[in-house]
Amino acid sequence: MNNYPWLTIITLFPISAGLLIPLIPNRGNNLIRWYALGICLIDFLLMTYVFGSQFDFYGQGIQLKEDISWINVIDFHWRVGVDGLSIALVLLTGFITTLATLAAWPVTRNPRLFYFLMLAMYSGQLGLFLAQDLLLFFFMWELELIPVYLLLSMWGGRRRLYAATKFILYTAGGSIFLLAAILTISLWGPNGPILDMETLSKQSYPLGLEILVYLGFLIAYAVKLPVFPFHTWLPDTHGEAHYSTCMLLAGILLKMGGYGFIRINIEMLSDAHRIFAPWLVALGAGQIVYAALVSIAQKNLKRRIAYSSVSHMGFVLIGAGSFSDLGLSGAILQMISHGLIGAGLFFLAGTTYDRSRTLILDDMGGWGSPLPKTFSTFTACAMASLALPGMSGFVAELMIFLGIVASSVYSPLFKAIITCVEGIGIILTPIYLLSMVRKMFYGYNDISLKTLKDSLILDASPREVFIILSLLVPMLGIGFYPDLTLQLWNQKAQEIVSLPSGNEKSLTLISYSYPVEKNFSLHH
């Protein structure tokens, strides 16, 4: 049972099943919808079963490994595995994609292609989180881009082609740096190309080479996360994409950058990370405030939510650079939490647009009375986004805050400045979120009154209520009992901060699990 290729099946099943969509009889869209939803649900249930029965939550290292030689001449293997860092993101991918497929029910134009692209995107994202080969990692990184571009360019707003072109230019540009970094690190040394991540993580590199490779990876991940100033594609993309696509972008795609940064830049290139981490922490703190201020100025609902995503990703940078397992665990939890919250906010923004036919906040108002279900669930998601105690966002941001404070690597002055800037961002967050809720659901203006009078507005359907409640339940569950998810990656976070990669490397890190500072070295 343990030797069964579960991860390969989980990865390839969606796209393989998607190839059968053209064979479905042309009897309307319902059959195609149910088929795509069934594929997503089966894959999600399968990964839940496999991880629940085969994964050792207290084990170390990569588990459920599969290694199949693919192209021998360049040592390219289908090499996949899962550990505490990737398991949560794989489960998040299955969960969000299943709900996004259900959210795409209103799509009627070319549904065969639409659902195939969603299933192809699903496989690409799963493959990236499970890849243990650098070239396979890059292959999945690129595979995921094609469906996203087509989903953006064919379904969305009037400026969807502009948004799709901007997205592909940014991400393709980042991919050039990603490929260059992969080739540099894999070809270094006398033993030929080495693409196995586990082998590469145990090697030592000259500091200059490590810095160069670190920067190459960082640029690629900075586009995807996104990090200022590589973030400008995100508001345009979210502003034009169909809301089911927005759920996939906010819920999963942004996490690919954070995952790659932790997996490669921190775990494999620890010496370079020690040099750049303070700058990234400062950049993350500045990004929180900058994106919050820009979000306040946005008049478009989806663009305001998009800039809130940029702001929240600043916390991921701070946690990843905190040099503490508490901060690193908080960064991972922030990615999971934002995946749920972002998907919920964009879904509700999209369903509100379907009813009001506007995304301009100044044209809204008074939607609370005719849309009580939408009002209550949107408010709940906004509360989770502003880190209300009892919601997942609060736990993640608190862990990151305490992680940077507990770090012994940084000076008290540096930590004081960062925490003060974080505090400013935390104060600004309710301003743009609560004002957004107020403009949408409270008060009236001439335009909103005319819309309310001229149209019969129905509240959220049972399908829509099910989707948003499915997202709210884990937000509350994590908020009240964070160990529900933290146990998935706490062990891995401690490994990363306590065992720097490479031979004869020494890095002073603090682990919140230990009472005193430790200096860890590896000698082989």
Swiss-Prot record:
EC number of this enzyme: 7.1.1.-
Segments crossing the lipid bilayer: 4-24, 31-51, 87-107, 113-133, 134-154, 167-187, 211-231, 242-262, 275-295, 308-328, 330-350, 386-406, 417-437, 465-485
UniProt-recorded Gene Ontology molecular function terms: NADH dehydrogenase (ubiquinone) activity; ubiquinone binding
Species lineage: Eukaryota, Viridiplantae, Streptophyta, Zygnematophyceae, Zygnematophycidae
UniProt entry keywords in alphabetical sequence: Chloroplast, Membrane, NAD, NADP, Plastid, Plastoquinone, Quinone, Thylakoid, Translocase, Transmembrane, Transmembrane helix
Enzyme class, first EC level, given as a word: translocase
Protein name: NAD(P)H-quinone oxidoreductase chain 4, chloroplastic
Gene Ontology terms: biological process: ATP synthesis coupled electron transport; electron transport coupled proton transport
Taxonomic source organism: Staurastrum punctulatum
Cellular compartment(s): Plastid, Chloroplast thylakoid membrane
Membrane topology: Multi-pass membrane protein
Catalysed conversion reaction: a plastoquinone + NADH + (n+1) H(+)(in) = a plastoquinol + NAD(+) + n H(+)(out); a plastoquinone + NADPH + (n+1) H(+)(in) = a plastoquinol + NADP(+) + n H(+)(out)
UniProt-listed InterPro entries: NADH_Q_OxRdtase_chain4, NADH_Q_OxRdtase_chainM/4, NADH_UbQ_OxRdtase, ND/Mrp_TM
Keyword Chloroplast: yes
Similarity annotation: Belongs to the complex I subunit 4 family.
Disulfide bond as UniProt keyword: no
GO cellular component, one term: chloroplast thylakoid membrane
